[in-house]
C-alpha cells in the first residue's frame, strides 16, 4: 500500500475536521449578516454564490448542453426563491434564519448520528458514507430546532416542527441529488473553492432543496403554513 492509498490517520482526520469547522465559521458570518441586513447585501451574496455554482456546474458537466440547461434551472430557481423570500419586509429575515437553522442542523445532526451510530447505508451507490441513522437523526434534531422557533415568534411548535421535518427531508434529498450528479461525472467535489468542503455546490446543495421545499409548501398549502409566511 503506497502513501497515496493509505487510509487517513486520526491526526489527519482531526485536521480535516478542524479545517471544515473554520471554513464553515468563516462562511457563516457573512451569510448571517446578509440575512440580517437584507437587500441588497443578501441579494448580492446569493448572486455571487449562483455565479460560482454556475462555473462549477459547467466544469463538472464538461459543457454538455443538456446538463448545462439542467444546471440553469437547478441554480436559478432556488436562487430566485431565496431572494424572493428575503425580500418580504415583514417576514423575510425570520424565514431565511429558520431555513438556515433547519438545514444546518440537519447536516450537523446527520453527520454526528451517522458517525456515532453507524448501521445500514442510506444510498450506498450514491453516497457510501450516509446511513439511515444519520438520516433519521438529522430529521429528528432539525424538527426540534424548527419547533423551538415558536418560543420567540408566534406559531405552533407542532406545525413548525412538522414543516421543519419536511425541509430536513428535502435538504437530505438535495444532498443525495448533488452526490448522484458528481458520481455520474466521476468527481468527488464540484471544485476546491472552499477549504475542507469542496465547492459552493457541495456546501449549498441542501439549502437549494430546502428553499424549493418552502416555496412548494407555501403555495400548495397556503400562506399560513408558518406564522410569518
Segment roles from a protein language model:
Residues 18-31, 37, 46:
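The first (N-terminal) embedded transmembrane alpha-helix
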Residues 38-40, 132, 229:
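Interfacial loop-to-helix junctions that mark the boundaries of transmembrane helices
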Residues 34-42, 154-156:
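Transmembrane helix interruption/hinge and helix-loop junction motifs
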Residues 48-50, 212-217:
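Core hydrophobic alpha-helical membrane-spanning segments
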Residues 216-229:
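Juxtamembrane boundary at the C-terminal end of a transmembrane helix
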Residues 43-46, 201:
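Hydrophobic/aromatic positions within or immediately flanking transmembrane alpha-helices
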Residues 1-25, 54-210:
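Interhelical loop and helix-boundary elements at the membrane-water interface
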Residues 46-56:
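Central hydrophobic cores of alpha-helical transmembrane segments in multi-pass inner-membrane proteins
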